[in-house]
């Protein structure tokens, strides 16, 4: 069964996470939270000035982005504690707004029903910072619920220095 993921913030990082996750059968993106409407988000997903055209059928159905027939709920909520993560069965939230990089603020996603939060930036007060290829073996599912994946610079350089 696929892990249910929600993306909070559908900018450059959020859309790239979606592109990668969509092609992974072990991941199901069930929702996107962003202040922009579904039609604009669908267009930005389909046509990326850096990565090119997303090679899947992308359309809109009300408040949903539809990719290859799969509906992804679009929400526009500024308070993460009010998001319907529990109702949607969200296990992991990718926090990519840049606004909730403190553990205490990111914890609102857990209040909303998510099991884990991955912050796509350096964070303060997170349970652990993980850099793949460097320290991912330190992850403990029972203890670590708010995870930072450090900065893009750290992710580029740290594996070489390890």
What is each of the regions a protein language model found here?
Residues 1-162:
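N-terminal Rossmann-like NAD(P) cofactor-binding subdomain of oxidoreductases
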């Amino acid at each position: 069964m696929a892990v249910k993921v929600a993306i909070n913030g559908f900018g450059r990082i959020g859309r790239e996470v979606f592109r990668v996750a969509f092609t992974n059968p072990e991941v199901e993106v069930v929702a996107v939270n962003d202040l922009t409407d579904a039609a604009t988000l669908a267009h930005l997903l389909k046509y990326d000035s850096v990565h090119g055209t997303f090679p899947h059928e992308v359309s809109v159905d009300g408040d949903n982005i539809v990719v290859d027939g799969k509906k992804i709920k679009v929400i526009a909520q500024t308070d993460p504690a009010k998001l319907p993560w529990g109702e949607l069965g969200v296990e992991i939230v990718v926090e990519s707004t840049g606004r909730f990089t403190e553990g205490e603020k990111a914890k609102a996603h857990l209040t909303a029903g998510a099991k884990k939060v991955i912050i796509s930036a350096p964070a303060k007060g997170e349970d652990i910072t993980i850099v793949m290829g460097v320290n991912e073996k330190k992850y403990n599912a029972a203890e670590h619920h708010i995870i930072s994946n450090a900065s893009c610079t750290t992710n580029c350089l740290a594996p070489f220095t390890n």
